[in-house]
């Protein structure tokens, strides 16, 4: 049938949309590889002296034996005494943690507004408007070498985080609305695939002989402006979402025109009838507030389970690995930690592609549990490898293998699954609010990990992943006892299972919109 094929216009439009997802991934990974170079620059800007060991590390990473050049405005002051040096080193650590975590702050703030902006401006104009934030953030970071680097990088990553918070809802929504029903799940996962591809590209570009060195690290940080500019140009040729035009604006003529371009056919009657049914069913359900999600017995257990799934995803330690993998591999004794980090990114991308095939064949709950159990054992082996590294040099390979497997198990289940399951927990009325709250909680947990991981790692040393092993075990047990299977079940069946566990009465209305679930998927 015509609606089942991928037309040139559809492929072009999806590619254009996931350029935002690519930027999202690039911004996640770009701060990792040049960590030592940027910290070294922070120290010089702030006048904090380097001890011999750190100097050797920094200059080796920089690929030069010459200290970083500092502009006259930031000339290093006279040497500090030992107490002042120790205190200032903590300041540098704090500024670096803020440089990493400020990205999540921006995403946390903006995550509630992606849907609102898409409804207000339309999907295309909303993505165009969001790119102004991406370009601003890239400009701030690109200029950071020539000013107070710590302030400009923190500001730039905050603004970039705002952009990513917006598009984390906009892009999956837009792709889900333009995709044929039978292709919606597969095309929806391209958001996640583009994201992890962005992470991988940022890690490759961050190699010291490419851009991750003292001369070019600011270019590396500002490079996300390139896909932003490209997307701004290509969006001018993309059709608006037909569902937005028909359901929100009630412009049937424009909706048909958009559908004809996307489907490559003049007969779009089936799509129009589907949207008409969706509009009628949506109009019978009232929107649900955040407070109602917790006070209404019909929604309380599903939202608590949804939040726990997202907490499990973030508190598993995955972003600690993504943000700080280079330093983790250094601790593990890997001679070329940046290349090991790139290996993590490659495995991340490969298993994201694998999950596209698995998610529709195995149950959501089954995949999530499989991933969590695998991650639990990986954190144990990772920790054992780090603890015994001083006694057995080959333990570095144990830790590295455990990290690779950890990422693989994450992408099999805990990475993509929460977004599918949260959408399946709720009908059309409460779904937007529930998804917004879930996205917000995801960003909050992301921020906590980004801000605190370095301090926790410094405090616990090689034992840090034993902590995450305990956390993963708790969430695994919660999933086993509390999370229902949703594969192949209607909303009424899922809601009935929740009501059975909570002992609440059936809701007055439960509209089924299972065909639109995949459009809600995000990172």
Curated annotation (Swiss-Prot):
Gene Ontology, cellular component aspect: apical plasma membrane; brush border; cell-cell junction; cytoplasm; plasma membrane
UniProt main location, coarse: membrane
Record text on activity regulation: D-glucose and maltose competitively inhibit fructose transport. D-glucose, D-fructose and maltose inhibit deoxyglucose transport.
Post-translational modification: N-glycosylated; required for stability and retention at the cell surface of pancreatic beta cells.
Residues exposed to the Extracellular side: 32-97, 148-157, 208-216, 324-337, 389-401, 454-460
Biological process according to GO: carbohydrate transport; D-glucose transmembrane transport; dehydroascorbic acid transport; fructose transmembrane transport; galactose transmembrane transport; positive regulation of insulin secretion involved in cellular response to glucose stimulus
Catalytic activity: D-glucose(out) = D-glucose(in); D-fructose(out) = D-fructose(in); L-dehydroascorbate(out) = L-dehydroascorbate(in); D-galactose(in) = D-galactose(out)
Positions bearing Phosphoserine: 522
PANTHER family: SOLUTE CARRIER FAMILY 2 (PTHR23503), SOLUTE CARRIER FAMILY 2, FACILITATED GLUCOSE TRANSPORTER MEMBER 2 (PTHR23503:SF27)
Family statement: Belongs to the major facilitator superfamily. Sugar transporter (TC 2.A.1.1) family. Glucose transporter subfamily.
Protein name as catalogued: Solute carrier family 2, facilitated glucose transporter member 2
Species annotation: Mus musculus (Mouse)
Lineage of source species: Eukaryota, Metazoa, Chordata, Craniata, Vertebrata
